[in-house]
Amino acid sequence: MLDKETYYLKKMKMLMLHTFNMVLKTEEVALKETDLADVLSVAEMHTLVAVGRHEAKTMGTIAGELLINVSTLSIAINKLEKKGFVRRIRMEDDRRVVRIELTDKGRDALAQHEEFYYNLVEEVSSQMDDDEKKLFIQSLENMARFFEEKLDIQS
């Protein structure tokens, strides 16, 4: 028989892995149900999220948000640029600096992705009372803080 702490750890491990995989699978399925299914992968969609809706960002900033190196990001940005989702902007004052921004097509794709997550969170939280929602938020904040500290990330 397991002691209480071992039971909790095993249960949390199983639930974290299962939940992470189910969120990714749900995202894949939802993407396949859109007009973007044949055009964008989930990883490319996450890159669009990191590029963001508003002001253009440098490759270094985007790579930092995705926790990947700039050369890996370059490959993804090249593909997204060819597909018409992002554009590169060279700065007039320093032509070496390149910023990335979403095109209208990229903003439309991002809007679909944001709507998917809004609906997902709305569905999940509809099963919770206010106390459960507060506890869920607190738990997610604690997890986010743990991983940010573990990876030495400033939020």
Please report, for each region that a protein language model flagged, where it lies by residue.
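N-terminal helix-turn-helix DNA-binding core of bacterial DNA-binding proteins
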Residues: E27-N69
